[in-house]
């Protein structure tokens, strides 16, 4: 029925389970008994849009879905807010966030923000200073929330996570151990 689920959300109040597969055109909606209910289309504005790796947050009461995807440089947007029928309400262009197509990159979210989707774009080979953002479900904009100052040091592979009362930044350095082999150390 589905393979390679990249993100999910359980909404006990609405009685729904939402599943986002890898390379998705829609979010699958099930009830809490596991019965399929419907799809939420994700490409309402851009017919050929496929979410390669993405995170989402559904607000069933407000009929809104926030989506952030791994912003490959050929895609039109990095994030958007839409209704449950796939109609875009707001969108965020990629600008400085775009990355070369490389599936070692990740979209990170703990879904800790109550009124937004917290998200960090973790780039593995394209190292750069970046920020943990909130995609606000009301205004559809990315708001910066947390970053680390690397100063004059080399930028390490890093990711940021949000929790209810704090942020965590994790640093990792790749070490070449063979001709084409790396391992990481923290």
Write out the residue ranges for each language-model feature.
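Eukaryotic scaffold repeat domains enriched in small/polar residues
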Residues: 1-186
């Amino acid at each position: 029925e589905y393979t390679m689920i990249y993100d999910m959300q359980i909404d006990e109040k609405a009685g729904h389970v939402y599943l986002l597969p890898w390379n998705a055109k829609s979010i699958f909606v099930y009830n809490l008994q596991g019965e399929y209910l419907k799809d939420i289309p994700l490409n309402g504005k851009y017919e050929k849009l496929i979410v390669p790796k993405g995170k989402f947050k559904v607000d069933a009461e407000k009929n809104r879905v926030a989506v952030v995807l791994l912003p490959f440089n050929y895609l039109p947007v990095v994030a958007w807010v839409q209704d449950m029928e796939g109609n875009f309400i707001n969108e965020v262009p990629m600008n400085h966030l775009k990355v070369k197509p490389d599936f070692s990159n990740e979209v990170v979210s703990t879904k800790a923000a109550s009124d937004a989707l917290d998200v960090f774009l973790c780039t593995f080979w394209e190292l750069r200073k970046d920020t943990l953002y909130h995609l606000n479900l009301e205004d559809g904009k990315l708001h910066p929330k947390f970053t680390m100052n690397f100063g004059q040091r080399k930028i390490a592979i890093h990711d940021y996570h949000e929790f209810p009362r704090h942020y965590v930044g994790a640093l990792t350095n790749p070490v070449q151990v063979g001709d084409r082999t790396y391992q990481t150390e923290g």
